[in-house]
Structure formats: C-alpha cells, structure tokens
Design a protein with these regions (language model features):
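Short, small-residue-biased leader/transition segments that mark boundaries at the very start
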Residues: 1-5
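Helix-to-loop junction immediately C-terminal to a conserved catalytic motif
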Residues: 39
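Conserved ABC transporter NBD signature motif
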Residues: 47-55
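Conserved ABC ATPase "signature" region
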Residues: 55, 102-120
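Conserved ABC ATPase signature
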Residues: 125-129, 133
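A short, proline-enriched helix->beta-strand linker immediately N-terminal to the Walker B motif
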Residues: 144-148
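Catalytic Walker B motif of ABC-type/P-loop ATPase nucleotide-binding domains
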Residues: 150-153
Length: 242
C-alpha cells in the first residue's frame, strides 16, 4: 500500500500501487474536493492522508515539496501549452524540476511519446492534434518525472466513447507497467467497468463503499445502487432489457 485516507481512527480507503483507483459519485458528492486534497492543493479540516506511511499534514515544507515531485496530474482538459510543440510540452516539467541535459530530456520525452503512440507528432503543436492525441500527450507529460502517484481529473471529458476506451486502456497499461498509484475522479461508467481495480463511492462527502469493477454491480449499498441506476449502461447490465 502506498496511500490511504483515514477518517478518525478508521481507514476509509486505501490506494494501491499498480492499480487504477477510482473516486466515483454523483455531482456534488465531493470527488473533486477529495482529489484536490489528495494532490495537496489544500489540507483536510479533519481526518488524515497518508503517503508512504507518512501523514501529510505532519510533513515539513521541504518534505511536502519532495512529495509533490512524486505526483503527476492529468487535467480534465488537455492543459497543453499552445506555444510549445508536443516534444516541448513533455519536456516542460523536466526543464524546471531536473538538471538533465537537453539530450537527456529529449531522449526521455521521445521514449514517452513512443509509450503513448504519438512518436510521429513530436514537432506538431497541440492545435494540430485531435482531442484523443492531446490526451495522450497529457499522459506522457504527467509521467515525465517518473511519479509514484498519478491523479486524473475526469480524463475522458470531451472524448467520444471509442477514444475514451483507448485512453482508459492506456492509463491502465501505464499504471501497471510503471507501478504507479493512479487515482482517477470519474463518473464515466465505461471507465469504471473497464479499468476500475479499486473503486471508492462518495456520497455527501463520505466514502460509503469500496470495491472493484467485478463487485460494484452486485452492491447492496442503496445510495450506490441509486447512482448506478441513474446510468443507462449500468442500468441495462443490472436490469437487462427484454
């Protein structure tokens, strides 16, 4: 285990290395607030967040800075810099947070472009790419500094269903290959059922249920059942149409 949230003395949810951990729930349930808290944008009013057996609020400022260097973020939009090429976008965090040579940075960026299947577009600019290709570049940039944790905020927002599945599988593959603890905020049922290794359901700011994609459709948690039945895909699986 690399990370967990504690509510008073109980472990509310644990996030596992090499797994796609998902935070799901209706709009207003607290997914985005919790994700931002886990990233370290602000601290919790109560409860605890533990990284590698260390409680976040008890870390020194220097320790927090070092921890933040282990974190990669994939934003809801592409969040790419229009004035930088694809290669330049991936090199951006390396420019500011490493002492690597220009050759080393380019080598690492090209390696990552190959991993996300965008190796033939390194000299293009973001506005020359499709939404799916921009998202691939965003993934490459998010893991440019070899993070231990990857936070994804609605990574499939704005993508068509077919592209969403491709991005889901890419995130899952990267997570497992690099041994990253990935934490994803999503309401996309396809994503949940495709790659949800560990799922936490939030309801009114509380994690009510934790399980995986294999157990979620047989849940007896009433608020979770109501959430699932509000989704056409899940509803048709739970209650097949005649």
């Amino acid at each position: 285990r690399q990370m967990c949230i504690r509510d008073r003395n109980d472990v509310s949810m644990s996030f596992m290395e090499g797994e796609c951990n998902m935070l799901i729930g209706a709009s207003g349930s607290g997914k985005t607030v919790l994700l931002n808290m886990l990233i370290g944008l602000f601290e919790p009013d109560s409860g605890e967040i533990w990284y590698d057996n260390q409680e976040f609020t008890k870390l020194s400022e220097q320790e927090k800075k070092l921890l933040h260097q282990k974190i990669g973020v994939l934003f809801q939009g592409s969040a790419l810099f229009d004035f930088r090429t694809v290669l330049g976008n991936i090199m951006f965090p390396m420019d500011f947070l490493t002492d690597w040579s220009e050759a080393e940075k380019k080598e690492k960026a090209r390696y990552l472009l190959d991993k996300v299947n965008v190796k033939d577009s390194e000299d293009k600019y973001p506005d020359e790419l499709s939404g799916g290709m921009q998202k691939r570049v965003g993934i490459a940039r998010a893991i440019a500094l070899n993070p231990s944790y990857l936070f994804c905020d609605e990574p499939n927002s704005g993508l068509d269903p077919e592209t969403s599945i491709v991005i889901d599988r890419l995130i899952s593959s990267i997570t497992k290959e690099f041994g990253i603890t990935t934490i994803m905020n999503t309401h996309d049922m396809n994503s949940i059922l495709e790659i949800g290794d560990n799922i936490g359901f939030l309801h009114k700011g509380t994690i009510l249920w934790e399980g995986d994609r294999h157990s979620i459709l047989s849940t007896e948690c009433q608020p979770l059942m109501e959430f699932l039945c509000s989704n056409t895909l899940a509803r048709n699986i739970i209650r097949p149409q005649k």
